[in-house]
Amino acid sequence: MSAIVDIIAREILDSRGNPTVEADVLLESGVMGRAAVPSGASTGSREAIELRDGDAARYLGKGVLQAVENVNTEISETLIGLDAEEQAFIDRTLIELDGTENKSRLGANATLAVSMAIAKAAAEEAGLPLYRYFGGSGPMAMPVPMMNVINGGAHANNSLDIQECMIMPVSMTSFREALRCGAEIFHHLKKLTDKKGYPTTVGDEGGFAPNVGGTEEALNMIQDAIAAAGYEPGRDVLLALDCAASEFYKDGQYVLAGEGLTLSSEGFADYLATLADRFPIVSIEDGMAENDWAGWKTLTDKLGRRLQLVGDDLFVTNTRILEQGIDQGVANSILIKINQIGTLSETFAAVEMAKRAGYTAVISHRSGETEDSTIADIAVGLNAMQIKTGSLSRSDRISKYNQLLRIEEDLGDTVSYPGRRAFYNLRVR
């Protein structure tokens, strides 16, 4: 038995300078696991609740001392003495202890920090890499990265309505080569951005945030950077978008202020279809607002056979909502964000449900990150085959890529890089 003997939480800072929760879990053997929780900027209304203090005199109200206190008292007192290897039981205990549907009493930032730290301690106790502890001894695949190279929307202070324009290297035979491809494109994009007279400062997720004329200009710049780096758009590298459409959905209309357009759900679906016809786009995330289920159905019927349609704000890593989407034929993929639901067990259940339904699952960071790289191990351990963890700058993003490099080295010839096979439910061009 790997008995838990102590749990200690503290307030640390995330990549935006906002407080978040970090937890240490100590086992009887002396082994310790440590985990830190991320935080989002554009959030779904049905996400598990991130408990903030609301004291304007500290961190503009964003302090997490109450969440830390909840870990150091009630959670710690409940879990000390339990076996760290009983992850599912521990997570159920956390859920029952909180007693609310959205973890609003203890805070999902409190429960997740503990859930993750316990898993890390148990993996260390078992002498296993974290990805093996999650996934067992079977064959594993490295994830294809979604690399956010141009930021807009809530992640940048510019006129681009679409929140993220991303690249996905698919023709490579290893993650290492895919990462090199992405880095080379990123550096060529910086040169092109500078040449056009745009600032080369970066947004929350490490991508550039130029004040471009619209989505098409952003995508053309990315295609030019791909070509300048010696790769072929559509063959070596595919494109992906995160619309974060809930952010510009107003009174039943999609208001693209940067484009000067106001569109119905059908009109916005047509707009996205036109982009997909003009550019080698393979994936669109949150292409409709989270509450526009009719719009989501329209989009899925129109594009769901040829594009990955990812529900982020739509599903919020929640199996109950995902099940509704599966039943209604809405979207064909789910974005997995561990802090949207608040425990590892619930996160893993969402991935499993998606796979059983033929949906893909994309493991994701948040715009407010830390140096914690657990999502890299989750992506490999669960054979998710896709990861979204930002651009090729900022150490809070690079830490995940570097962990994936270590995992690939550790697995050697036994691991594959799926490339286009990551989109197993599509007719990928």
UniProtKB/Swiss-Prot annotation:
<keyword id="KW-0324">Glycolysis</keyword>
<dbReference type="GO" id="GO:0006096">
    <property type="term" value="P:glycolytic process"/>
</dbReference>
<dbReference type="GO" id="GO:0005576">
    <property type="term" value="C:extracellular region"/>
</dbReference>
<feature type="binding site">
    <location>
        <position position="366"/>
    </location>
    <ligand>
        <name>(2R)-2-phosphoglycerate</name>
    </ligand>
</feature>
<keyword id="KW-0460">Magnesium</keyword>
<comment type="function">
    <text>Catalyzes the reversible conversion of 2-phosphoglycerate (2-PG) into phosphoenolpyruvate (PEP). It is essential for the degradation of carbohydrates via glycolysis.</text>
</comment>
<dbReference type="Pfam" id="PF03952">
    <property type="entry name" value="Enolase_N"/>
</dbReference>
<dbReference type="InterPro" id="IPR020809">
    <property type="entry name" value="Enolase_CS"/>
</dbReference>
<comment type="pathway">
    <text>Carbohydrate degradation; glycolysis; pyruvate from D-glyceraldehyde 3-phosphate: step 4/5.</text>
</comment>
<dbReference type="InterPro" id="IPR020811">
    <property type="entry name" value="Enolase_N"/>
</dbReference>
<dbReference type="InterPro" id="IPR029017">
    <property type="entry name" value="Enolase-like_N"/>
</dbReference>
<dbReference type="GO" id="GO:0009986">
    <property type="term" value="C:cell surface"/>
</dbReference>
<dbReference type="InterPro" id="IPR000941">
    <property type="entry name" value="Enolase"/>
</dbReference>
<dbReference type="Pfam" id="PF00113">
    <property type="entry name" value="Enolase_C"/>
</dbReference>
<dbReference type="InterPro" id="IPR036849">
    <property type="entry name" value="Enolase-like_C_sf"/>
</dbReference>
<dbReference type="GO" id="GO:0000015">
    <property type="term" value="C:phosphopyruvate hydratase complex"/>
</dbReference>
<feature type="binding site">
    <location>
        <position position="312"/>
    </location>
    <ligand>
        <name>Mg(2+)</name>
    </ligand>
</feature>
<feature type="active site" description="Proton donor">
    <location>
        <position position="205"/>
    </location>
</feature>
<feature type="binding site">
    <location>
        <position position="242"/>
    </location>
    <ligand>
        <name>Mg(2+)</name>
    </ligand>
</feature>
<dbReference type="GO" id="GO:0004634">
    <property type="term" value="F:phosphopyruvate hydratase activity"/>
</dbReference>
<comment type="similarity">
    <text>Belongs to the enolase family.</text>
</comment>
<dbReference type="InterPro" id="IPR020810">
    <property type="entry name" value="Enolase_C"/>
</dbReference>
<keyword id="KW-0964">Secreted</keyword>
<feature type="binding site">
    <location>
        <position position="337"/>
    </location>
    <ligand>
        <name>(2R)-2-phosphoglycerate</name>
    </ligand>
</feature>
<feature type="binding site">
    <location>
        <position position="163"/>
    </location>
    <ligand>
        <name>(2R)-2-phosphoglycerate</name>
    </ligand>
</feature>
<feature type="binding site">
    <location>
        <position position="367"/>
    </location>
    <ligand>
        <name>(2R)-2-phosphoglycerate</name>
    </ligand>
</feature>
<dbReference type="GO" id="GO:0000287">
    <property type="term" value="F:magnesium ion binding"/>
</dbReference>
<feature type="binding site">
    <location>
        <position position="388"/>
    </location>
    <ligand>
        <name>(2R)-2-phosphoglycerate</name>
    </ligand>
</feature>
<feature type="binding site">
    <location>
        <position position="285"/>
    </location>
    <ligand>
        <name>Mg(2+)</name>
    </ligand>
</feature>
<feature type="active site" description="Proton acceptor">
    <location>
        <position position="337"/>
    </location>
</feature>
<keyword id="KW-0456">Lyase</keyword>
<keyword id="KW-0963">Cytoplasm</keyword>
<protein>
    <recommendedName>
        <fullName>Enolase</fullName>
        <ecNumber>4.2.1.11</ecNumber>
    </recommendedName>
</protein>
<keyword id="KW-0479">Metal-binding</keyword>
